[in-house]
Each structure stands twice: as C-alpha cells, then as structure tokens.
Amino acid sequence: MTDAATAPTSIDLRAEYEGSGAKEVLEELDRELIGLKPVKDRIRETAALLLVERARQKLGLAHETPTLHMSFTGNPGTGKTTVALKMAGLLHRLGYVRKGHLVSVTRDDLVGQYIGHTAPKTKEVLKRAMGGVLFIDEAYYLYRPDNERDYGQEAIEILLQVMENNRDDLVVILAGYADRMENFFQSNPGFRSRIAHHIEFPDYSDEELFEIAGHMLDDQNYQMTPEAETALRAYIGLRRNQPHFANARSIRNALDRARLRQANRLFTASSGPLDARALSTMAEEDIRASRVFKGGLDSERRAAEALAR
C-alpha cells in the first residue's frame, strides 16, 4: 500500500485513462474491427477494472491484482487473434504486464512427440510469453482422453501451475469453438477455476462482412464496380451457408481469388496501356466466376436467357 502521508486524496480516472495510452488502443480496436460490440464492451470493462485498481493503489487502499486469464470462444475468422493482440497492448499500457507482446501457439508448439519432450517445449513457450499474453488457439486439442500415451496432459499441468503462480506477469487466453471449449473445461476443471473472463465472439452479419471486404480492398487500393458490389453481397449470402465458412477469413480468401481473376482478365484482354483505375477495379465477373455461384456468371446468364425464351 502507498504511504498514507504521500498518497493523493483523489484520482481523475479520465486523466488516468487518457494518460496511460489505453484510449489509443481502444480507439484502434474500434477503427480496425467491424462490429463485435459485445467483445469491445468486455475489453472496456477490463480497462476500467485495471484503471480503478491503479487508482485504489495510488490512494493507499487495499487492492488485489485481478486474474485476467481468459477464454475466447467463437467461429473462425471472428477476430479472436486480433483482439488478443490488442488486449496485450492494453494490458501493457495499464501496467498489468511488463512487455505487452503476444505469443500465439497451438498444440504442436507445446506438446512433444516422445517422453521428456513436452516439458521443455512448454516451458520454452512460457518463457517467451512471460511479461505478455500467451494465446493458445484450439486449446481443446491439448487434451486427448482417448489416447493414454498422449503427452498433452503434461503440458496442461505445467500451464496450470504457471497460470496460478505467475498470474501477475502472464495472461493466458484459450481460444476455440464454444462447444469444444465447454467440453474441455468440463474435463479440465483446473482451467475453469483459473479463467475468470469468458468472451464470446459472434459471427459477423452479411452487412458487416461486406463492410470488412470494403476495408480490405481499400487497404490494397482496389475498388468495385456497382455490379461487383451486388455480386459480392450475393456471394456473402451464399458462402455463409456452405461448408468451412470462416467469416472474415473467407472474405479475405474470396477477394484474393477475385484479384487473380481480375489480373487474368486484364492480361488476356489487354491490347494496350492500362491506367490505374483499370488496374484497380474489380468487375462483376471477377466475383461471380467463383464456384460458390455454381458455374459463375456465364451459367447465370444462360439460365436467364433460357427463362426468357
């Protein structure tokens, strides 16, 4: 506790918030991530908690460093890794961790292939992550109860010990599908008791995915014709209901393939110089050539012509 003779008598939380740099991190989060309001609200709550704890410490009040180990649950492509990176920066700005870096791993980075291999691998990862945030994606793969010779349990035991003993210098975030994470916690109650914050990442709406696509294209100096925009909206609605849909990740992959088609279209049709606008414009056919449309633009036109006869 702070010496009573030197402790201030009041704290301006707004000034603390702006002076810590936390405001910049949260503003970046709002700018860079579309939607995810429930997630952003939880992050702001975490920032408020740490600001109040800092204020209590400065006023000489009893305070306890909160446990901030977390689970992020949601489908792929909903921003879990990006939010973990921002969380690391926020925790550093607010003095919770020393470095504020993110170490992102999966089972393969923690679990060895033979006896005596897992402990050194896990401890090396923890050493790199100390002072920051350790993000374990698809954490449930650490636990394989159907295989008695699996070494994942050894990694789990080491993680649990460090999460308890070093919780003031390391934040562990476990991420994955909600149902699998729930089964994982039921099978490993030690994790459930050490994780105080469970944050759900909702799927993006069609409109949010379209907005995300616009940001991705802007970042690469591309634009779409109005017809291409209509095609992309249709693509999003169809792709959502097909296998292996991964939210923003699927949109990024779709735009990468559209760039390939646009480049091939320009190269094949080119008979002279192309200006910057031509090189930067996505056309309807670049989007509708996707197999998501079951044959692309030509098949749709043929079907429309057949109906018109």
UniProtKB/Swiss-Prot annotation:
UniProt-recorded name of the protein: Protein CbbX
Residues reported in the UniProt entry to bind ATP: G74, N75, P76, G77, T78, G79, K80, T81
Alphabetized InterPro entries for the sequence: AAA+_ATPase (IPR003593), AAA_lid_6 (IPR041627), ATPase_AAA_core (IPR003959), CbxX/CfqX_mono (IPR000470), CbxX/CfxQ (IPR000641), CbxX/CfxQ_RuBisCO_ESX (IPR050773), P-loop_NTPase (IPR027417)
Result after altering S250D: Abolishes ATPase and activase activities
Keywords: ATP-binding, Nucleotide-binding
Subunit structure of this chain's protein: Forms homohexameric rings. The oligomeric transition is triggered by ribulose 1,5-biphosphate.
UniProt source species: Cereibacter sphaeroides (Rhodobacter sphaeroides)
Gene: cbbX
Entry GO MF terms: ATP binding; ATP hydrolysis activity
NCBIfam families named among the record's database cross-references: cbbX_cfxQ
Function: ATPase involved in the activation of red-type RuBisCo (ribulose-1,5-bisphosphate carboxylase/oxygenase), which tends to form inactive complexes with its substrate ribulose 1,5-bisphosphate (RuBP). Catalyzes the release of RuBP from inhibited RuBisCo in an ATP-dependent manner. Activation of RuBisCO involves the ATP-dependent carboxylation of the epsilon-amino group of lysine leading to a carbamate structure.
